[in-house]
UniProtKB/Swiss-Prot annotation:
A single GO cellular-component term on record: extracellular space
InterPro entries: 4_helix_cytokine-like_core, Somatotropin, Somatotropin/Prolactin, Somatotropin_CS
Keyword list, A-Z: Disulfide bond, Hormone, Metal-binding, Phosphoprotein, Secreted, Signal, Zinc
One Pfam short name: Hormone_1
Annotated PROSITE patterns: SOMATOTROPIN_1 (PS00266), SOMATOTROPIN_2 (PS00338)
Gene Ontology MF terms: growth factor activity; growth hormone receptor binding; hormone activity; metal ion binding
Official protein name in the record: Somatotropin
Reported function: Plays an important role in growth control. Its major role in stimulating body growth is to stimulate the liver and other tissues to secrete IGF1. It stimulates both the differentiation and proliferation of myoblasts. It also stimulates amino acid uptake and protein synthesis in muscle and other tissues.
Protein family membership: Belongs to the somatotropin/prolactin family.
Chain residues that bind Zn(2+): H45, E198
Disulfide bonds: C78-C189, C206-C214
Annotated localization: Secreted
Amino acid sequence: MAAGPRTSVLLAFTLLCLPWPQEAGAFPAMPLSSLFANAVLRAQHLHQLAADTYKEFERTYIPEGQRYSIQNAQAAFCFSETIPAPTGKDEAQQRSDVELLRFSLLLIQSWLGPVQFLSRVFTNSLVFGTSDRVYEKLKDLEEGIQALMRELEDGSPRAGQILRQTYDKFDTNLRSDDALLKNYGLLSCFKKDLHKAETYLRVMKCRRFVESSCAF
């Protein structure tokens, strides 16, 4: 699987240049509606970033004829598929806000280690050397979710009740087909997990604060 020419490669990371509502770690006392709004916006940014990165990696490294068969095998690769987390909006609406926050926290924390190796996956470090910023944004979202948990649980988040897991780090040996497939699978899981976290946060925000943007 030889690397092909990259087209519009910068698009994969344009969202990294967009301003965030506040700096990382900045979750002071504020209305619950603002906490939810900020967390949802952060999750949307990260989900779009994950989707763009996955798409760019696929275009660059995965032959088109192999994509369908590989994608069919990727669901079992994601450990998040083995936990009782809702798989979509309808299922999420059947869970309590505290449950959804705990699942969101689990998903975010499972990627804090692996994303620190993300920049090493790509040969063009000037473009993809942004792993630290992705990590910072994940930490920022983690803190936002923990702030929401403190508000809703009336105390500190009970992290001990969440089974913490993590994914393997990305493989830097891009000359190996096995490494390429591993990274492709990891990026697929990253995209899926960020989509789940975004969905959970949007469901919670919408049912607490009725608004026109609840249709998604």
